[in-house]
């Protein structure tokens, strides 16, 4: 606290002995010791309080940093959830659009390995009747 060496302390004691005398010196020394002790305890008290405040500030900063990290993580999760919802909606709309464009593909889908049978349809033979008599032949 004070940068006082032994030689300076001895000089102060000699001056105090000369000024106060041998009768009042012990009482003054006790009083000076009491003042020094009070000053040290006050200094230690202030120092401890300051350290507690600094620790409290550090804890508050750490808590705020942790809350910010949590907030950022929640925002990222919400963004990812919205992206997933959008992707699901797009997928559903894609499937609905495919069904609307090609409705027969969904109902008549063929599995691999099934045979496909082709049926040939021919038109009926042309009729020999004349068109003017409504399908009846002329008799002569």
Curated annotation (Swiss-Prot):
Its main location: membrane. One of its GO terms (biological process) is protein transport by the Tat complex. Residues 128-140 have a biased composition (Polar residues). It comes from the Bacteria. GO terms for molecular function: protein transmembrane transporter activity. Residues 119-140 are annotated as: Disordered. The chain crosses the membrane at residues 1-21. Pfam families: TatA_B_E. GO terms for cellular component: TAT protein transport complex. It is a single-pass membrane protein. The keyword Transmembrane applies. The keyword Ribosomal protein does not apply. Keywords: Cell inner membrane, Cell membrane, Membrane, Protein transport, Translocation, Transmembrane, Transmembrane helix, Transport. It is found in: Cell inner membrane. Part of the twin-arginine translocation (Tat) system that transports large folded proteins containing a characteristic twin-arginine motif in their signal peptide across membranes. Together with TatC, TatB is part of a receptor directly interacting with Tat signal peptides. TatB may form an oligomeric binding site that transiently accommodates folded Tat precursor proteins before their translocation. HAMAP family: TatB. NCBIfam families: tatB (TIGR01410). Belongs to the TatB family. The Tat system comprises two distinct complexes: a TatABC complex, containing multiple copies of TatA, TatB and TatC subunits, and a separate TatA complex, containing only TatA subunits. Substrates initially bind to the TatABC complex, which probably triggers association of the separate TatA complex to form the active translocon. This is Sec-independent protein translocase protein TatB. It comes from Xylella fastidiosa (strain 9a5c).
């Amino acid at each position: 606290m004070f940068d006082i060496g032994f030689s300076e302390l001895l000089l102060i004691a000699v001056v105090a002995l000369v000024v106060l005398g041998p009768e009042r010196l012990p009482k003054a020394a006790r009083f000076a010791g009491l003042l020094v002790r009070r000053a040290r305890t006050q200094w230690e008290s202030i120092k401890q309080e300051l350290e507690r405040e600094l620790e409290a500030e550090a804890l508050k900063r750490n808590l705020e940093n942790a809350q910010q990290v949590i907030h950022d993580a929640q925002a990222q999760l919400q963004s990812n959830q919205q992206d997933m919802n959008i992707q699901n909606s797009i997928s559903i709309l894609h499937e609905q659009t495919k069904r609307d464009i090609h409705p027969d593909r969904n109902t008549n889908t063929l599995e691999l390995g099934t045979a496909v049978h082709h049926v040939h349809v021919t038109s009926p033979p042309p009729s020999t009747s004349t068109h003017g008599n409504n399908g009846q032949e002329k008799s002569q």
